[in-house]
Curated annotation (Swiss-Prot):
GO terms classed as biological process: 'de novo' pyrimidine nucleobase biosynthetic process; pyrimidine nucleotide biosynthetic process
Taxonomic lineage of the native organism: Bacteria, Pseudomonadati, Pseudomonadota, Gammaproteobacteria, Vibrionales
Details of cofactor binding: Binds 1 zinc ion per subunit.
Name of the featured protein: Aspartate carbamoyltransferase regulatory chain
Organism of derivation: Photobacterium profundum (strain SS9)
Highest taxon of source: Bacteria
Protein role: Involved in allosteric regulation of aspartate carbamoyltransferase.
Gene Ontology CC annotation, any one: aspartate carbamoyltransferase complex
Length: 154
């Protein structure tokens, strides 16, 4: 007899699990945290069935713990994702995602005339959240962009 509730993605002993990522966003999260360049084992589930979301992505990273700062950056891509820190196969800590007030050196400014493209300065955005409409305002050119425009380019 086979078990009907078998895990589709293997459990990890120690590390981080990022769950409830909207489908087709998991690859962007990998790049955000530069997980495609790590030596640790990363397990990715794409378009997994989800009763709440229809389909979701999932990322498990062994021996790497997502920080609260990283979890807050994740909120730009997946505001309802969950981040669990795993120790000895058990959830040791659940991180709450909150949108950061500022984001530095993560995204490029979409404005091709912005000085961040030609000067040796890190990009810097202020996060604006009005009625769940998330926008990013560039510190240098002061232009405001939708979250989708900024995150799609990176």
């Amino acid at each position: 007899m086979t078990k009907e509730t078998q895990l589709q993605v293997e459990a990890i002993k120690n590390g981080s699990v990022i769950d409830h990522i909207p489908a087709n966003v998991g690859i962007k999260v990998l790049k955000l945290f530069k997980l495609h360049k790590t030596n640790q084992r990363v397990t990715i589930g794409l378009n997994l069935p989800s009763s709440a979301m229809g389909a979701k992505d999932l990322i498990k990273i062994e021996n790497v713990y997502v920080s609260e700062e990283q979890a807050n950056q994740l909120a730009l891509y997946a505001p309802h994702a969950t981040v669990n820190q795993i120790e000895n196969y058990d959830v040791a800590k659940k991180l709450t995602l909150e949108l950061p007030k500022k984001i530095n050196a993560i995204f490029e400014c979409p404005n091709s005339n912005c000085i961040t493209h030609n000067e040796p300065v890190d990009s810097s955005f202020t996060v604006i959240n009005k009625n769940d409409d998330i926008q990013l305002k560039c510190k240098y050119c002061e232009k405001v962009f939708s979250r989708e425009i900024v995150t799609e380019r990176n």
